[in-house]
Amino acid sequence: MSIASVASVFKGEHAVGSTVTVRGWVRTRRDSKAGISFLAVYDGSCFNPIQGVVPNSLENYDNEVLKLTAGCSVIVTGEIVESPGAGQAYELQVTHVEVTGWVEDPDTYPMAAKRHSIEHLRELAHLRPRTNIIGAVARVRNCLSQAIHRFYHENGFVWVSTPLITASDCEGAGEMFRVSTLDMENLPRTSDGKVDYDKDFFGKEAFLTVSGQLNGETYACALSKIYTFGPTFRAENSNTSRHLAEFWMVEPEVAFATLSDIASLAEGMLKYAFNAVLAERMDDLQFFAQHVDKTVIERLQSFVSSDFAQVDYTDAVDILQKCGREFEFPVSWGIDLSSEHERYLAEEHFKAPVVVKNYPKDIKAFYMRLNEDGKTVAAMDVLAPGIGEIIGGSQREERLDVLDMRLEEMDLNKEDYWWYRDLRRYGTVPHSGFGLGFERLVSYVTGVSNIRDVIPFPRAPRTANF
């Protein structure tokens, strides 16, 4: 006898006729007049539960098996047999059922209903992993995460753990969560009445990071190829389906790399990750295609087989102005492209993933390399059909005098970035990188449109439960 996951049984990793023990939770119980019960037991290792055929000859059949309801936890031992019914290749002829946990009141068990709205499930974030949709999201999220780590490992990158607490604003937007141990009801003040952060834990103002990029650059300028993969925070008061206050970012940084180099890196990473999901999580993708978005499988297959188009921002604006489409937000040179513009380019004009590059400097961050025209920077966005922007990146400004000029233009104190400026003073090199919002990637792959449903415990304005 061996402990087996449901997935390993369905994959044929255990011989027909062998005895295995499966541990999980009851999804359903059906009883037949012939004195047999059918238990659907789910352990989360794959989308489908396994069927256990339980005879009434078991010692605890009447007093326990017939009382099992959805959500009860069980340890089931039985012989693997080929299933005569459609839908699964194998089932268990059960010889032993151990009940490890009962549902206190089946009538009030929140997950007992056949179907809940996705909005209602957000109020039950501690129980929603038990549902088909959130379980499938979790497995796909894990698959994508593992694939991304694997991709960078196989390509010689070093994973760097960048700090979550920082004194630097990477984006220069100021939308940061402050970290403080000061007594909010008795704040120390300076002589001019301002909060005296010298008395705070770090002796200065500190914040939750909006990006690991600046710290990542320091390691790229020593180890050549690095990436970060961790949580980031934005105090942006946007209560939309596309925004979270806490989300995960993948941020590679490569020394001696140009904008073209990281555009190729982004394409390789996305295709690698999507191929992994297509190969490893087809059961979950089939669920999403049936119940969430019928195009998900076809969209991923099309993505991995397409060459990325490339277009300059200036040319993209020209395409949008001449396309004859009336957009909600009018198009002119100098604007940041909105989602409707991005999706038109990817879905209707190029009909493929597209890299838009060389954006106006005034709508991009201080660290992006100024182009020779003095008006644009070496920035790029990767636009995907079906969602729009999925990656943003740039060649970094490696010239100290130009970096200082950009900091001044954006009214940022260069003394706050002294260590970042040091990279340009001691052996500076051209280098480039990008950021991938991981939840947006999971949303794209699953078709689950609200980003709050693709992270286990969403953090958003007025939402910090659990």
Curated annotation (Swiss-Prot):
Localization in the cell: Cytoplasm
Gene3D superfamilies assigned: Bira Bifunctional Protein, Domain 2, Nucleic acid-binding proteins
Root EC class: ligase
Protein family according to the UniProt entry: Belongs to the class-II aminoacyl-tRNA synthetase family.
Protein name, per record: Asparagine--tRNA ligase
Keywords, sorted A to Z: Aminoacyl-tRNA synthetase, ATP-binding, Cytoplasm, Ligase, Nucleotide-binding, Protein biosynthesis
Organism: Shewanella sp. (strain ANA-3)
The keyword Transmembrane belongs to this UniProt entry's keyword annotation: no
GO MF term set: asparagine-tRNA ligase activity; ATP binding; nucleic acid binding
Broad class of where this protein is predominantly found: cytoplasm
The reaction(s) this protein catalyses: tRNA(Asn) + L-asparagine + ATP = L-asparaginyl-tRNA(Asn) + AMP + diphosphate + H(+)
An example Gene Ontology CC term for this record: cytoplasm
EC number per UniProt: 6.1.1.22
Single biological process term from Gene Ontology: asparaginyl-tRNA aminoacylation
Gene of this entry: asnS
Record text on subunit structure and interactions: Homodimer.
Cited PANTHER family: ASPARAGINE--TRNA LIGASE, MITOCHONDRIAL-RELATED (PTHR22594:SF34), ASPARTYL/LYSYL-TRNA SYNTHETASE (PTHR22594)
Keyword Repeat carried by entry: no
